[in-house]
Amino acid sequence: MTLLSEQVINKTKTDYNQRQGEVMFRLAKEELEKLGASITAKEIFQQPGLWQEAYQLYVSQLEAVESFLSGIKEKHDLIQVIFTGAGTSDFVGQRIANYLNQVNDLKHIRFSTVGSVELVGRPYDYLQADIPTILVSFARSGNSPESLAAVEIAKQLVDELYQVTITCAPEGKLAVAAEGDTDNLLLLQPAGSNDKGFAMTGSFSCMSLTALLVFSPASQEENAHWVETIIRLGQDVLDREDYVQDLVNLDFERVIYLGAGGFYGLAHEAQLKILELTAGKIATMYESPLGFRHGPKSFINNKTLVILFASNDAYTRQYDVDLLNEVHGDGIAERIVALSADKLAGTEAANFVLAEGGAGLPDVFLTFPYIIFAQTVSIMSAIKCKNLPDTPSPTGTVNRVVQGVIIHPLEK
């Protein structure tokens, strides 16, 4: 069993502790409190340490994870895994499902992703009675009405249903329901991932990491290497917050995030973060680089930031660079920035290059430092707009845990 190196563990703790006593996002803790941003800032900054904790929790439960999954695989030739969740929890599946289909044997296990809001509203589109299914529920609180209803509907419609519950709140209804259920594997996340702020930050990244570790066939040595690398890359992004602040200081009113494959799901989450934290004061959009030309490019004016999550895949990256060059050549957007693991060749667009070591990562692991960049853009933009990141909805009509949902009974 492979653990993270002591060097990585100690450096992560030191980096976080040093920043806690000084400044985050160029502001002292007291200033952040006055701006209503201290909780969210802390929860963004602590993520590399949380990834370390999430990995250690996974290792401590590895025997139970392997026993649970092997027991299911022995019973069935083909298993369907459905990732589900509401809001940001939905985007966990969008971020990881493609990768898991690439690295697993599709003759025996297949991955799909659908938001619990869709699963509840259109259950027959996604659930089949005669297909053995593992429903993987992602939830920060475990109390969202749609997440709870999705489980009950799946139980009602699927003959052989198993569950993996990945949640941040041990007292949440999903976690409580999983206790003592031999067909439901409960994987609680680090206590610090149960974000106290409005926005899901550490909860999103920790649940993503845990699901990757659980369902990837990679060796434990590979897992440890990849986790060590994302911790280092994530910390480096935080250390370069001045770059992000200079970007946010530009004159913009719109932001578009672009990404292909798992980065498309990440772009969905990134645009939601800035939309939430600025309470809509900044207009947002997400698209794929190839899809952007088919109408959504109309979104760009001279007060638009375009941020692209570039792929490590050489084939896909060609399309990333083509789009960057096209938008840069148009000369309309305020700024075009590409995030990449190594320097992008063949483009004059601005390029935020991760620290050394990212070039060898599968794309799905680049999503971890990339999302820290996007979260940083979001909190800085909220502060710039004079909105309160910790409680961003001035009217109170948008809540940390969704309210007002009526779940209607399903009649078979």
Q: Which residue ranges define each predicted feature?
A:
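Glycine-rich phosphate-binding loops that contact phosphosugars or nucleotide phosphates
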Residues: K75-E228, F309-E348, V353-G357
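Conserved phosphate/anionic-ligand binding catalytic regions in large, soluble enzymes, centered on
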Residues: A37-T40, Q46, F83-Y99, G261, ...
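Short coil-to-helix leader/linker segments, especially the first N-terminal amphipathic alpha-helix
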Residues: G49-E63, L106-V114
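Phosphate-moiety recognition in structured ligand-binding domains
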Residues: T2-A41, P48-E53, E179-D183, L305-V306, ...
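Residue-level detector of alpha-helical secondary structure
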Residues: E43, L50-E53, Y99, I153
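Active-site phosphate/pyrophosphate-binding segments
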Residues: K42-E43, A54-G71, H76-D77, E179-I307, ...
